[in-house]
Amino acid sequence: MAFSSKTDVNSSIDLSDGYDRLAQSLIDIIKEQQAKLGYRKEIVRLYYPLSSLNHFFEGHLDSTGMLDILKEASLPECITDKLGCIKATEKNDRFCIEIPPQGSEYVHENTSDDEFIKELIKLVAEHDCRPQQIIDLFKKFSDEIEIKQIDNGEFDFYVRFLNDPQDTYYYCFHDEGCHMIYHRFLPQDYSDFKF
């Protein structure tokens, strides 16, 4: 497939790094899903707001422009060789990215397990999980972490690695009383929430 790092949609946007960031995000989420639910060679549907996709491509495209660069004919090999021909649909600036079974299989067979995610999922699944246990788990994987209390009604605190370019996520936690829940955000998305 021929690929140009520029698009007619907005010729000032270099798309090649954006496609790489999108591919890595899709792989990260599939790995997390497989750690939680196990591997199945099946279609995976992941949802992104337009703002998140624009962060990947460092642009300000509208929904139509984003659909144009996510069309099958526009996709570079960095995505199709690994995840197959993904399909994107949009409703109200919310995008569904459908990854064919080939993508699940690729992640299962060609990426290493994320030991941190596996341990985190196991820990938060326990009914007596406490914040200090979560912090201790992060410290097991790095001495350089940031912990911050959040008072926004949705999350209680976040923890993030400061020295891992492969894991730049903000892991936000909320104590539901009987168990702990978490959601992870890329730095740009976390910033958008203005917590």
PLM segments and residue spans:
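Short glycine-rich, basic-tinged beta-strand/loop micro-motifs
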Residues: 39-60, 116-123
